[in-house]
């Protein structure tokens, strides 16, 4: 399973427009399964965008740690065999409390939401 990141503002706007917005306690997930042509022609199956606001934490070190945790969570979730044939894109926006919650609980919450909406 191959994952790549959303590169520019245009890609983020496309996913925001085409995707379904899901509000959870620790994050907001925008997930799109009906992708435009630019994504379908790619060799990658999963497209990931992460938006960590300065409102969440002023320190860049903490914001970068949150991004690393999200990337690792997605790698774990997408490595499951049920995602092999599906192409989808998502944007994850963490909320307050995301950095304090333990990793296993985040894994459970995120995988539950993704599996329910693909």
Swiss-Prot record:
For this protein, what reaction is catalysed? Endonucleolytic cleavage of RNA, removing 5'-extranucleotides from tRNA precursor
Pfam families xref list: Ribonuclease_P
What broad class of enzyme is this? hydrolase
For biological process, the GO terms are: tRNA 5'-leader removal
Q: Which UniProt keywords are given for this protein, alphabetically ordered?
A: Endonuclease, Hydrolase, Nuclease, RNA-binding, tRNA processing
Q: Which InterPro entries match?
A: Ribosomal_Su5_D2-typ_SF, Ribsml_uS5_D2-typ_fold_subgr, RNase_P, RNase_P_CS
Q: What is its EC number?
A: 3.1.26.5
A GO term for molecular function = 3'-tRNA processing endoribonuclease activity
Q: Does the keyword Nuclease apply?
A: yes
Record keyword Nuclease present: yes
User: Entry's SUPFAM superfamilies?
Assistant: Ribosomal protein S5 domain 2-like
Taken from the UniProt entry, a GO cellular component term is:
ribonuclease P complex
Summarize the protein's role.
Answer: RNaseP catalyzes the removal of the 5'-leader sequence from pre-tRNA to produce the mature 5'-terminus. It can also cleave other RNA substrates such as 4.5S RNA. The protein component plays an auxiliary but essential role in vivo by binding to the 5'-leader sequence and broadening the substrate specificity of the ribozyme.
Family note = Belongs to the RnpA family.
Subunit record text = Consists of a catalytic RNA component (M1 or rnpB) and a protein subunit.
What protein name is recorded for this chain? Answer: Ribonuclease P protein component
Q: Which gene encodes it?
A: rnpA
């Amino acid at each position: 399973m191959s994952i790549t990141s959303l590169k520019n503002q245009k890609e983020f706007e496309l996913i925001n427009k085409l995707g379904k917005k899901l509000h959870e306690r620790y994050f907001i997930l925008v997930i799109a399964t009906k992708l435009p042509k630019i994504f379908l022609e790619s060799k990658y199956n999963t497209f990931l965008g992460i938006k960590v606001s300065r409102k969440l934490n002023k320190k860049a070190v903490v914001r970068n740690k949150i991004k690393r945790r999200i990337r690792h969570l997605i790698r774990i979730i997408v490595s499951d065999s049920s995602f092999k044939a599906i192409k989808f894109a998502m944007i994850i926006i963490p909320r307050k409390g995301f950095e304090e919650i333990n990793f296993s609980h985040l894994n459970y919450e995120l995988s539950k939401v993704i599996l329910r909406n693909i």
